[in-house]
Structure formats: C-alpha cells, structure tokens
Amino acid sequence: MPLRAEITTSLFGAWRLFKFDPGGMKYFNHTADGFWRSFSAALIALPMFLVLSILHTTDAEAGRSTGIGLHLLRYGLGWVVFPIVMVWLVQVLERRGQYASYIIAINWLAIPQWTLVLVVSYLGMALGGIVGDLFVLSLLMLLLYYDYFVTRLVLDLGVGKTILVVVIGLLLAVLLDALILSLG
C-alpha cells in the first residue's frame, strides 16, 4: 500500500480508537513495514507539538537558544524510548506476538491525542485559573484512559497488568521530562 493511502487508512483507524471503537485496529498495517511506517505519525504530530511548545514556553526559556532544541529532543526521545522499553516488557508479560500491533496502534493514536492536547491546552490557557487547571487535569486522565484502552485491547491483559504498562509509560514520560529539564 502506498504511504499516503496507509497514512489515510491508519488515521481513520486511529480516529476509531479515539472514539473507543476496537474496530479501529483493522485499519492498521500490522506488518513489519507497517510498524516502521507508523513512526511517520511523529512527523504528522510534530507541528502540533511545536505549537504547544511555543504556547508553554516561558519568557526565560524563549531567551535561550536551547529551548526549542530541548523540546524537540524530548519529543524524539518519547517516540523511541517507550517502544524500546516495551520490547522488554512484552517479553515479561508474554505478549511478544502483539508488540508490533501495540506500537502501531499507540503511534497512530498519538495524532488525535496531540490534536486534543492542543485544543484543551489552548482552552485551559484561555480560561485560566482553576477552570483551566481542571481542563488540563481532565485531559491527563483521558489520555491515561486512552493508553489503558489500547493497552488492554491489543495486549489482551488483565486490569492490573494493563495499569502496570500505563504507569510505566507515564513514569518514562516523567523521567524524560526531568532529564530534559536538568539539561536546560
């Protein structure tokens, strides 16, 4: 399948997953090529990430030339570190056969998730105060639930193991953020 058609089909599958429809999985290319092509989602979501980075950049960060570079480093590491950790984790969980499909789904789902993050972040900033904070907190809970939904669906795990995978992903994100902040 040509890349453009695969992107379109995969985005439709991601939209279905975004609506909590398990049928979205059938729109992904579950081959080795499909696995590697799913990382093109990082390029598609990049403009949204850049807008968010600019929205959340403080005046002090804006004055440093390393600010956007560190944001980009964090973004890139986020797309690489979790799949690498999952290579080990799916072995521990005895789910190696579902690894590629899981990463494919997580990668493509990132596009509607980044879209949601952009919209909710903008609304949260516009509303400000406690209402804005509640928007952001609600967003975080929803994103974690998306991770839970896809993890449980694709890896076919029980509740406890699914939560473990989601928490490991969250801890990796926090660790990467702390690492990047220490470099700035």
What positions do the PLM features span?
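Selected alpha-helical membrane-embedding segments in polytopic membrane proteins
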Residues: 2-104
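Hydrophobic alpha-helical transmembrane segments in multi-pass membrane proteins
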Residues: 41-50, 79, 109, 113-117, ...
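Membrane-water interface at transmembrane helix exits
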Residues: 53-57, 86, 90-94, 116, ...
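Residue-level signal for the membrane-embedded core of alpha-helical transmembrane segments
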Residues: 76, 80, 84, 110, ...
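C-terminal halves and exits of single transmembrane alpha-helices
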Residues: 81-82, 108-127, 182-184
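Amphipathic alpha-helical interface surfaces
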Residues: 85, 98-99, 111, 115, ...
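Cytoplasmic-side transmembrane-helix entry/capping segments in multi-pass membrane proteins
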Residues: 98-107, 160-164
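Terminal transmembrane helical module of multi-pass membrane proteins
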Residues: 121-184
